[in-house]
Amino acid sequence: MQCLKSAWRVMMILPILTSSFVLADDHMLNGMNVQQPFNLQANLCKLNPGVSLEDYHAMVEDYLAWAETNDVDPVFVRQFPLFSHQTLQRPWPYDFVEFLASDYERWGKSWDLWLTSKSGMALNERWQELAVCDVKQAHSQVLYANREALESDDERYVTWNWCTPKVGFEQLSQKHAQYVAELTNNPTGMIGWAVVFPHTGAANMPGEFAHLAVYPDMESFMTRRKSEATGGWRGQREYEQNYADCTGEQLNIETVLHRP
């Protein structure tokens, strides 16, 4: 039954991902064709005792050099929670989360090299000495993008909002297309919007897919909140009443560490 449920989720969500929403004149963003779904790896990491972030980052820099040499380097970002859902009773078990975005074939090649080449295995061993990281894989697609802002801004803010659909993919896709048209006309501070659908290792996520919204600064984030407070909440309420149940947004600080 669980396998059938997972298969249904894939059949419903993937058409949403493959709908044409983004970048009408140029579908390339950070070296990837974001008109199509791409792979997004999440590393949820906690540093080992005595290891500093500087120690860990030195390994990441060596990894990126290795990945560039082997022509498998991803878009690489790191996020820290700013406004999270966690409490003293439910603390976040990680120090940070990293996201590595790449097309599927390139990422498969990267993992083959990581697991079988001498240099890849050495880096993997070093990685595991520095931190414990739970690794997850997901489908993702950008639905709205201010390309210039996204490719030039290395320090930004990202909200995550996990949702579970109430309707079929046609209705959800149409609603997302309507939302993209509204963003294109008036982004109210947002420079990017994407959806993420886990495909491997993420059975315990808080929803079946996530909305990601990207902001260049906190002023832009609060501009969006003002828009919601002055009437935009009606659209959010309609979405959650009729299209999907969502957990609510969490805001993370994001640093872009590498672009291919």
What does each of the following model-derived ranges do?
Residues M1-M11:
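Bacterial N-terminal signal peptides that target proteins for export
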Residues V10-S19:
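Bacterial N-terminal signal peptides
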Residues L23-P260:
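Short S/T/G/P-rich N-terminal loop/turn motif that feeds into the first structured element of a domain
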